[in-house]
Structure formats: structure tokens, C-alpha cells
Curated annotation (Swiss-Prot):
Residues 23-335, 396-417, 529-536, 590-597, 649-657 are extracellular. The two metal binding sites M1 and M2 that are halfway through the membrane form a binuclear metal center. M1 is essential to Zn(2+) transport, while the other, M2 appears to have an auxiliary role presumably by acting as an additional transport site that can modulate the properties of the primary transport site. The binuclear metal center plays a key role in zinc sensing. The lineage of its organism: Eukaryota, Metazoa, Chordata, Craniata, Vertebrata. It comes from Rattus norvegicus (Rat). The chain crosses the membrane at residues 336-356, 375-395, 418-438, 509-528, 537-563, 569-589, 598-618, 628-648. This is Zinc transporter ZIP4. Keywords: Cell membrane, Endosome, Glycoprotein, Ion transport, Membrane, Metal-binding, Signal, Transmembrane, Transmembrane helix, Transport, Ubl conjugation, Zinc, Zinc transport. A motif (Essential for SLC39A4 endocytosis) lies at residues 462-464. Homodimer; homodimerization is mediated by the transmembrane domain. Zn(2+) 1 binds at H517, D521, H546, H550. It catalyses: Zn(2+)(in) = Zn(2+)(out). The gene is Slc39a4. The extracellular N-terminal ectodomain is cleaved when cells are Zn(2+) deficient, N-terminally cleaved SLC39A4 is internalized at a faster rate. Under excess Zn(2+) conditions, SLC39A4 on the cell surface is rapidly endocytosed, ubiquitinated and degraded. It is found in: Cell membrane; Recycling endosome membrane; Apical cell membrane.
Length: 657
């Protein structure tokens, strides 16, 4: 039976501000998942009062800067300048929960952000940073520890406190697993209900982890399993004597201890959520209730040893890459920088006009084009081999040590990721093969015999004649669809612009092929900026360098097909705009760290294909009256592209703004 909206709000308000009755859990989470109802001013005021009462700053009670008007303004994230509504709809409870989490984490800073009008943008950034599972676990653990520090009330020994696994489980039961909005809403429910929080695993968790790693069955550790454990830890030696009796006694002792540990096992200790959490020495001492002043006694050392073993076995601090928050971009910054980079790439299409406006300096244009061609080869191969492949394989480590067991764990997945690189290479091979099969064939080339290349195959050798901006005849050509053919009619001669029947489809095939290519480039740029701004910069540079000669070649090929300058420019620009579609798809989908890795793997295959199968043959097939000058320019571009990407790969961790 559907309750009236006013009655629903009244019941919700009673649950929020009632002091005598028991507060029911999950009321905000249920309201969010139902998509019905809203919070009025009275309900919000009671909610915020309860929230502020849970937080205590160093100088006493914290400022109540999170007002009702501020909360209602979160209901208009796209139009914050408009007057707030009288109620906060249920779908915006996610933003309210994120704002409350920021306030619980750092009340003073959040109040400054509210006064500066930055709360809405910081809420979006906070939700975006919790998207990946690793960031979710670490962020929630740190947040719960901050709540513990700011909470004046101390839980009793018998009280079971809320921890990270419980919040994730409640969010999964309510809707989507590991959704930041649902998890933070579940957290806000517990804050309002007066629950205590535990931001670190219990001591029993570390013992349970070791047993889970060694055996899936609830039994004692056997001698072979203990030997494997000691070998993994790098301790112990060869056993040259029979210790059967000793093993039997040890077996009995461990059985008794393990049965005792099973009695004290909790949900906190059995959850695998903590497996990827890297603990500091301060965290380990906090888990076992040890003060920094007193230090670790011999008795306490025996207690915390399982935590050290667990950290070694889980490789939480060695195999997991450290996330540098300063390198990550917020959602708004990803769209801004990604759009600017893609806009610069798309302007390459407009650059084709310079070929017409600077007809008298066509000699310089020819050599500039050849320099960019070699620079594109260097940038593409350099980005693929020096930056993208190490990132795809997880080799961009920020620690000084690389352990052998870490390399073994990466090995299997690395093979599949490298296979994705080959998949990207093969996909674009198939695309261009089918593209060439659909192209009309020139009758003159058919007379050359079965070994000749297709007549209008868009060969990559782009050689602009210094005399009248034409491409000269080449003995060899590759299959790149977005560069000029190797026929010799002059592009600017009006007599040669008569459309033959077999060329009518050529402009559209060129535009379609380039549109798909640019869409893939946009996906690569979007995934790169979703990772870090440094990866986005490197990928954008590589895409820009190879798009410049491509777009100029497209423009020349469209003119050769008989199109007017205006129409050729429009088609070239339209195909370039598909890069924005790929960019926004990659940014909007929110593929996460694992998805970004696979997209970058496929993009690596694309870069290698374009560089080695298209652009490198273009460099090798060019004939010029000044071969040594051309050789020098090719080397400058090739070595320059490699140098730029090498410096970026070596010193990217030292680059800060």
C-alpha cells in the first residue's frame, strides 16, 4: 500500500528527531533506493542538528555551517545559482550524504568550502574518487577513523561498532554493490542513529587471513603449508631430522588455539574487504590498542606479529600501486582538459586550409609535413612502448623495491593485457582491409597485374609537390585510408575535378574511416585523462602528432576526389568531431581503473599499427630532390618524439603544478 507523501515525510521526520523511540536503521538508504518522498526543511534541520552533535572540533563544538539552505542547494547541482527548493528530493540524498561525509572528515575545511561556494564541486570530486574498489576501502577506512577521532562518545566494550565491510554489505543489499552514494548514505544512517565506528580491522582478522591464504578448509595449518608459508616469507631452512612427536604436540596446540579463535571470529575478521588495505605502523598499533608513548612490549609483539605476516602475504603495500591524489583529476577537470586536448586535435582538420593559403610556400609545407610525419612515428611508438605498455602491465611502480612474488602475481594478467594490445592491432588491420575491399579500383592499376596495389587505396606517402601542391608518383604505397592516393592529377586544376562514377563513394568512405579512427582516438584520450593528467598529456601529444599529417592527407584526398574546398573542409571537420564522442563516452561511462587499463591496451595496439604499418612506410617511400635534408628532418622528428616520451616516462612523478 502506498502511503501519502505527507505521511511519509512525517514518519521520516519522527525517525530522525525522535529521542524517546528507537530509531530504525536504513531510513535514508531506503528513501534513496525507493526514489519516492523527500526531506522538507524541518526534517533537514533535525538531521543536521544530529549530525553536528556527533562532531567535536579541537576547540569545542564545531560550527554548524552545513545549513538547511546549503543542503537544499545540493538538489540543484547543475544550477546552483537558482533559489533552492523547499524540499530535497530523495534522488539527491547521495549529495547530502557526501557533503555530510566531508563535514565528518574535516569540519573546518568543509565550512571554508561552504563559505567559498565550493561544496557542490567538492562533493562531485569526492564521489568520483570513491569509484574504484581500492579507493573505496581506503577512503572509508580513513573516514571512519576521522569520525572516531571527532566523536566524543566512547563505545562500550560490549558494543559492536560499524565497520567498512558492514557498510559495503548494506549498500549491496540496498542496490548496487560498492556504489559510493549508497555506501555514504548507509554511513549517514548510522551516524544519525548514534552508532560507533571502527575504521580498522580487528586483531582476529589477521589470524583468519593467514588461515584463509593457506587453506580453504577450517582446519589447522599442516606441515607442508607451514613450509610454504615460511618459504614465501623468506625464513626457515632445510629440515634434516624427524620431528614427528613435536609436530603432533604442535598440532594439538594449534587445534586448541584455532578452535578458540573461531569462537571469537567476527564479521570484521572474516571479511576480505581489508585484504588490500596497506597499514602503517601507527595503524597496526591502533588495531591492538597500543599507545605510541608506551611502545610495543614483548607480550604485545607476540600479539601484533600476525598483522605483519598478513601485510607480507597480501602484498597490500607492495603490489598495489600508490594512488597519488594530486595526479588524479576531478570529474570536471577531466571533461575540461580532455575537451581542450580534443579540440586542439580537431583543429588539425582546419589546418588543411593552410595548404591553399600558402601555395607559394609549398616547399616549406612539404618539409614541415615530413617532419611531422616522423615526429608522429616517434610519438606513437614512444608513447606505446615507454608509457602505455608499462602502465598497462602495472610496471609504473612508485616504490623502490620490486619483489619476485609480486612479479609472479602480475605475470598471468600481463599476458592477457598484452593480448589486448595485439587485439587492438588486429582490429585496425581488419578495418583497413575491409575498407580497401570496399574502395573502387582504378582501371589503370588493374592493368598493371595482380601484384599491383589497389588504385584508390589512399596510400600513406603524402608528398606535396613544391610546384603546385600535388602528390608525386611513388613506386610503393601502403593501405592507409586517410591519406592521398598516388595518382598524379593536380589537385588545384579545375579540369581534373570531374567526378568519375567509381569515385563518387570515395569521399564518404574516407570520412567514415576517419570518423571511426577519431572515435578510437577520443576513447584513448578519455581513458588517459581518467587515469592521470600525465597519462592524458602523453596520449594527447601522440594523437596530435599523428592526426596532423592524417587530416592534411584527408583534405588532399577529398580535393582529389572532386569536392570543393568548402565541402572537403566540412567533411574533414565532421569526421574529426567524432573524437569528442569517443572522449565523452570514455569519461561518462566511468569504466574505472581496470577498464581504463584495457582501453589503453587496445589504444596501444592502434598506435603501433598506425605508426609501423602506415606512417613508417610513408617515410621510407618518399622521394625528394634533397634526400639528405629529408633524412635529417626524419631523424629530428623520430628522435624528438622518442626523447619527449622518454623524458615524460622517466620524470612524470617529479612533474607537479
Amino acid at each position: 500500500m502506498m502511503l501519502p507523501k505527507s505521511l511519509t515525510q512525517g514518519l521520516l521526520l519522527a525517525m530522525l528527531v525522535g529521542t524517546a523511540a528507537m530509531v530504525q536503521p536504513y531510513h535514508l538508504l531506503s528513501l534513496l533506493t525507493s526514489g519516492q518522498g523527500a526531506l522538507d526543511r524541518t526534517a533537514l534541520d533535525g538531521l543536521l542538528n544530529t549530525l553536528v552533535a556527533r562532531v567535536h572540533c579541537t576547540d569545542g563544538p564545531c560550527e554548524k555551517c552545513l545549513s538547511v539552505e546549503t543542503a537544499l542547494a545540493l538538489g540543484k547541482p547543475d544550477k546552483p545559482q537558482l533559489a533552492p527548493e523547499s524540499v530535497l528530493e530523495s534522488r539527491y540524498i547521495t549529495y547530502l550524504s557526501a557533503a555530510a561525509a566531508l563535514y565528518l572528515n574535516d569540519p573546518e575545511k568543509t565550512c571554508k568550502d561552504i563559505r567559498a561556494g565550493l561544496l557542490a564541486s567538492h562533493v562531485d570530486d569526492y564521489l568520483a574518487k570513491l569509484e574504484s574498489p581500492e579507493a573505496m576501502t581506503l577512503g572509508l577506512s580513513q573516514l571512519l577513523q576521522k569520525i572516531e577521532a571527532h566523536d566524543a562518545s566512547q563505545p562500550t566494550r560490549e558494543e559492536t561498532c560499524v565497520d567498512v565491510p558492514q557498510l559495503l554489505e548494506e549498500a549491496e543489499e540496498a542496490g548496487v554493490s560498492r556504489s559510493p552514494g549508497l555506501v555514504l548514505t548507509a554511513l549517514l544512517d548510522h551516524v544519525l542513529n548514534g552508532s560507533c565506528f571502527q575504521g580498522l580491522p580487528s586483531p582476529q582478522y589477521f589470524v583468519d587471513f593467514v588461515f584463509r591464504q593457506l587453506s580453504s578448509k577450517p582446519r589447522n595449518i599442516t606441515l607442508p603449508e607451514l613450509e610454504d608459508l615460511m618459504h614465501h616469507l623468506g625464513v626457515g631452512g632445510e629440515d634434516h631430522s624427524d620431528h614427528g612427536d613435536h609436530v603432533d604436540h604442535s598440532h594439538l596446540d594449534r587445534e586448541a588455539n584455532h578452535q578458540d579463535s573461531e569462537l571469537h571470529a567476527t564479521h570484521n575478521s572474516s571479511s576480505s574487504v581489508w585484504d588490500t588495505l596497506c597499514l602503517s605502523a601507527k595503524d597496526v598499533m591502533a588495531v591492538y590498542g597500543l599507545s605510541e608513548e608506551a611502545g610495543v612490549s614483548p607480550q604485545a609483539w607476540a600479539q601484533l606479529t600476525p598483522a605483519l605476516v598478513q601485510q607480507q602475504l597480501s602484498e597490500a603495500c607492495s603490489s598495489s600501486p600508490i594512488i597519488h591524489v594530486q595526479d588524479q583529476l576531478s570529474q570536471a577537470e577531466r571533461y575540461l582538459y580532455g575537451s581542450l586536448a580534443t579540440l586542439l586535435i580537431c583543429l588539425c582538420a582546419v589546418f588543411g586550409l593552410l595548404l591553399l593559403t600558402c601555395a607559394k610556400c609549398s616547399t616549406a609545407t612539404h618539409y614541415i609535413m615530413q617532419t611531422f610525419l616522423s615526429l608522429a612515428v616517434g610519438a606513437l611508438t614512444g608513447d606505446a612502448l615507454l608509457h602505455l605498455i608499462p602502465k598497462v602491465l602495472g610496471l609504473h611502480t612508485h616504490s623502490g623495491e620490486v619483489h619476485s612474488h609480486e612479479e609472479e602475481s602480475i605475470g598471468g594478467q600481463s599476458t592477457w593485457r598484452l593480448l589486448a594490445v595485439l587485439g587492438g592491432f588486429y582490429i585496425f588491420f581488419l578495418f583497413e582491409s575491409f575498407f580497401n575491399l570496399l574502395l573502387p579500383r582504378d582501371q589503370d592499376h588493374e592493368k598493371d597485374g595482380p601484384c599491383s596495389h589497389g588504385g584508390h587505396s589512399h596510400g600513406i606517402s603524402l608528398q606535396l609537390s613544391p610546384s603546385n601542391l600535388r602528390q608525386s608518383k611513388q613506386p610503393h604505397e601502403s593501405s592507409r585510408s586517410d591519406l592521398v592516393t598516388e595518382e598524379t592529377p593536380e589537385l588545384l586544376n579545375p579540369d581534373t575535378r570531374r567526378l568519375r562514377a567509381e569515385l563518387r563513394m570515395l569521399p564518404y568512405l574516407i570520412t567514415l574511416g576517419d570518423a571511426v579512427h577519431n572515435f578510437a582516438d577520443g576513447l584513448a584520450v578519455g581513458a588517459a585523462f581518467s587515469s592521470t593528467w600525465k597519462t592524458g598529456l602523453a596520449t594527447s601529444l601522440a594523437v596530435f602528432c599523428h592526426e596532423l599529417p592524417h587530416e592534411l592527407g584527408d583534405f588532399a584526398a577529398l580535393l582529389h576526389a572532386g569536392l570543393t574546398v568548402k565541402r572537403a573542409l566540412l567533411l574533414n571537420l565532421a569526421s574529426a568531431l567524432t573524437a569528442f564522442a569517443g572522449l565523452y563516452v570514455a569519461l561518462a561511462v566511468g569504466v574505472g581503473e581496470e577498464g581504463e587499463t584495457w582501453i589503453l591496451a587496445v589504444a596501444t595496439g592502434l598506435f603501433l599499427y598506425v605508426a609501423l604499418c602506415d606512417m613508417l612506410p610513408a617515410m621510407m617511400n618518399v622521394r625528394d630532390q634533397r634526400p639528405w635534408l629529408l633524412f635529417l628532418l626524419h631523424n629530428v622528428g623520430l628522435l624528438g618524439g622518442w626523447t619527449i616520451l622518454l623524458l615524460l616516462s622517466l620524470y612524470e612523478d617529479s612533474i607537479t603544478f
